[in-house]
Structures are given as C-alpha cells and as structure tokens.
Amino acid sequence: MSSPTQEKLTLMRYIELLEEDDLVVSRPSASYDQRIEFATDDSRQVRPGTLFVCKGRAFKCEYLLSAIADGAVAYVSKVDYDVDLPAVIVSDIRRTLAVVADVFYGHPSGKVKVCAFTGTKGKSTCSFYLRGILANEAKLTGCHRPALNTGIEFDDGIEAGPSKLTTPESFLLQSRIAHAAEAGAPWLVMEASSQGLKYERTGKIAFEVGAFTNIGEDHISPIEHPTLEDYFASKLKIFSQSRFAVVNLDMDKVDRVLEAASRCERTVTFSLTDERADVLALAIRNGDCGVVATVRTPRFTRDIVIPTPVKFNVSNALAALACAEALGISEEGIVHGFEGVFVPGRMELYPSVSGKILGIVDFAHNGMSLETLLRDLRENYPERELAVVFGATGGKGVDRRTTMGIAAGKYADRIVITEDDPGPEDVEDICAEIARNVQAQGNDNWQIVTDRVAAIETAVRETVRPAVVIVTGKGEEERMLRKNGPEPCERDGSILKRTLAAYDA
C-alpha cells in the first residue's frame, strides 16, 4: 500500500482524533510531535516513522517487536505491552483501525463518490452493472473511468487485480479509495459485506449511495453472525454512513430497511412489481441479446437490455439503475450502460458445439441464490434436463447445507454434490448433510463425488441430453480451502469447457 501525498500529521493529532470518537483509554504522558510517516496493522509493512496498530485475536507480541525493530515510532492497542515505545491504549481496536486508516489516507471518501451495495446475493453483479453505467457516463462526459472494489476483482485507477475479500480491512480499503481519488476517478463502486460493516472495515467511509438489495438467511454461525438479527442489523449499518439510500421494495423486512434508510437525505426505491417504487420494471421479456426490461424511472421510461439469460438479474440491474438515479447520471448513460457488461464467475455460459448441453458457471453459494437461479433456469429451459453441481463450505454458514439441499431437491433433475471450501471439516460429512436435505424433497437422483473436477465430469457425462449443466459456488476462484489451508484449484469454467469438449455427443 502506498503512502498518501497530503501533509503528515503528528502522533498527538492522531490521538486527538481518536479521543473525538471516545476511543482512548490511556495515552503517552509526554507530548509527541513526531510526524507519522506511515500507518499499518501489518508488521511486514512497517518502515521508519510508522504508527503500528495491534489488531486481531491472533496478535502476538513478536509482531510488535518486529515493528519496533523496523522503525515503528508508536503503537495503538487494546493491550498495554511491556515494550519501550509510546503506547495509545484504546477501547475498540476495530473502530480505531477505521479512524487511523481514514486519517492516514486523508479521508479519501470525501474526494470520491463511493457507492456501496450490501445484500445476501447479487452484490458483485450490482457492482459491475453500476460500474458499466458509470463507465458509459464517463465516456459521454470525458471524465475518468470509475473505480471498483468487489469480491471478484478491484481496479482503483492505479492498481488492479483479483480480490481476496469481499470487503477488505480498513487500511487496504482506504488505500484503494485514495488511489481512486489520486487517479481522478469521480466514483468508486464497492461491495459492503455484513462482516465488513459489522467489524468496521467500512468505518469512517462516507458513502454517497448505500444500497440494500435483499436479505436471506446466510452467514449464520458462531464465527460469523450468531443470529439472523445480528446479520440483518449489521447490514442496516450501511445507512448510518450514506448520503443517499437505495432500497428494494420486494425484499423481506422492507419496513425496517426503509426506517433505517430514513436518516439519509433521499431514498430511491426499486421493484419488480411494486407500483410505489421510483424505479420499476413494467415488463420483462427474453430478447436476442439478453433480457429486455421496460423500466420506469422518475425521469424516463425506456427498454433496457441486460446481458443475462435469466430474469432474476433484472432486480440487480434495477438496483444499479436506482443508484445511478440517486447520483444524477444521464438517461443515455444509464440506458446504454449495461451493454457489454461481463461479470466474471457469474452466469458464465459455455454452450457445447453440438448445442445439446448448455454449461453455466455461477457463484450461487447459499440457498436463496441457488433457488432463484434454478427456478429461473427451469422456467427458461423447460424442455432440458437441469443438472447442478455444488457443495457447501465447512466451518461456517452451516445452514447452507440445508437451504441449498432443499433448493436443489426442489428444482434440479440431476444433482452432483461435491466439495466447496470444506476447510476444517470432512467433505464427506458436509456432502452427506446436503444429501439428506435433497432427499427430504423427494428427489433421489443425486450422488456424492467429492473431487470437484470429477463431479463436473460426472454431471456432463451422465446428464440426459438436451440439458443445462450448472456448476455453482466457486465462480472465478482458483483456490480451495481445505484442512491444511488454501490449495490451488482449477477454475470451474476451465473444467467445464474442457469437459464439454470431451463429452459433447
């Protein structure tokens, strides 16, 4: 992460700003006019003049000693370590991280219009759609392209690459917003995960628009959210730091969402069916280049072509359009903003040469996403066998084994259950639990193939033509989390493409 270009502040100024948020428990007795040249929570990045933040349940004193050896001039921590270095002891290290990162990078969200999506499903697709609209607007107006930070990839105007987290930690996230400002990007589009909101990774970021797209049961576990209420409340936090709100009137618990959004200057609503919505889909039909939606907004009514074979993405498109409406983007910028938008690992199509099999790779990794996806595919391809390959994560989100099993059992003709980041658990046990929920729907056409490559091959080889074979859960990912940690794995799309070529008959 690079250093910001603005004037460096003193240690005392950092302390004063932390005190404004009532975070300081104790501070150095002397007045320190030492200028802070760098700030980080990663001991490997420390350089002379660094303010080092001690973070995490797994933090070890040796990390602090390493930071001191490399030139740290002070540290911030919940714990007072017995070291010869000025210490700022705080009550909440997560909130402190957000403050220090925001201060060090010069409050970059005040220089870029940051637009954030939260929701159980569709955050990445919404982000790419809005990025497409804003990129089109940039071409029309001659300004810099928008920046992007999603769970798939990031492009902050200076650096770009694959992402490791949906919403990264405060220092990395603030550095990307700072890069966007430095590059001259007017907007940055990002995903705000429930974990990112709950644990203050997004703290101190001023969102120009905060969008809440949907809510379902997911990420409920001892290491994520203990209850659905905690999960929901974490997502609602997005409005506490947003200027404008965007809300889906079709979502569950919408009254509470609208109440939380009422603190914002303006709320723009969208819906597939509710006439009260500011942005409404009047009609939806399949077209030659995707789904065509006739959309009514406060300023115009137009047909919009969304490059997707399934209708559920219309809701994601409406969310992006509603954000664009809140931002005041032009009609032409919006209407043509979806053209050519490609979301990696989401509804990637791999038709076989013979046309007998349509292969699809998608990221659907919870029951809500999988049910919506399979239901739409069943409607679109009623004459084809619908085969699905999927698994569920280990060590977290255990409810997915139930909800995904139920969804597959209800809608799929052929089911191959396999591994999907089993982590600390035995993949066989996870698959067996999914299978019980599939069978509970009266669906007996399932099998367990724990090796993911073999599972995809099995689905393609055994499906009855004509068929749709959909592989879900991993998308663009190239690593599998197993007991010994992350291991390299082949992309689902690569496996599917190769397998279709081998078994296309």
Q: Where are the predicted features?
A:
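N-terminal leader/targeting and accessory segments in enzymes
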Residues: 1-99, 103, 280-282, 309, ...
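Short, ordered loop/turn segments at secondary-structure junctions
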Residues: 79-81, 151-152, 215, 272, ...
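Acidic, Mg2+-coordinating active-site environments of NTP-dependent enzymes
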Residues: 81-84, 181-183, 198, 208-359, ...
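Short loop/edge segments at beta-strand edges and connector loops
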Residues: 77, 91, 150, 192, ...
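Residue-level signal for inorganic ion chemistry
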Residues: 50, 67, 100, 117, ...
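Phosphate-binding loop of NTP-binding sites
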Residues: 97-249, 253-266, 381
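ATP-dependent carboxylate-amine ligase
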Residues: 1-23, 48-51, 57-59, 115, ...
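Short, well-ordered alpha-helix to beta-strand connector turns
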Residues: 36, 48-49, 72, 84-85, ...
